[in-house]
Amino acid sequence: LFSQKKHFLRAKHNSYLIIYMPNKNIQFVDLGLVPYKETWDLQESLMAHTARVKLANRNQSEIRPTPNFLLFCEHPHVYTLGKSGDQSHLLMQESFLHTIGASFFKINRGGDITYHGPGQLVGYPIFDLENFFTDIHLYLRTLEEAIIRTCSSYGLVAGRIEGLTGVWIDHESQDPRKICAFGVKASRWISMHGFAFNVNADLSYFTHIVPC
């Protein structure tokens, strides 16, 4: 999906015009079960590294390709609240979290509150979107399409609901069931955060929130 569009980027160095092909290779890393804060810190580190490469390229005659990373993992039980989210959507006191073995983080992605836990595949694309396309709306729709195609490969009919971000099973019925949530951040066209795909998660943890 991300390799379908091909384009050249142009950069000026002194009086010369440099034309180079963007890097569409993606480095995949499976982190396994890992605490949320560790992956958040790793995302920030990879994003900062990519930003440094992009900044250095402005002043170099030879352009270094910017990397693209895709991190897969599961998390111990955790709730995360996006920067525009409403904390009242956490339907319990923070002091109650330890009784259900969960933690809570306010983070810098878009979207509201969501849950991560064992049995849920979480994906964090740390992409330089200038390697693909500079359109956040298209980026989200492309991530959704990847999940829809994955569901289809397992015999599940999934799709979108107009006006909403996410992927649902029985999306055209009166009772659609959300199977994948999305929340991203982009800075200098570098993405972080991503999607949460419910494969075999304990859905009872969603009863403690008003999910996004």
Predicted regions span which residues?
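Short hydrophobic targeting helices and cationic amphipathic motifs
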Residues: 3, 8-9, 17
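Catalytic cores of processing enzymes, dominated by hydrolases/peptidases
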Residues: 177-212
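N-terminal lobe of the biotin/lipoate ligase/transferase fold
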Residues: 19-176
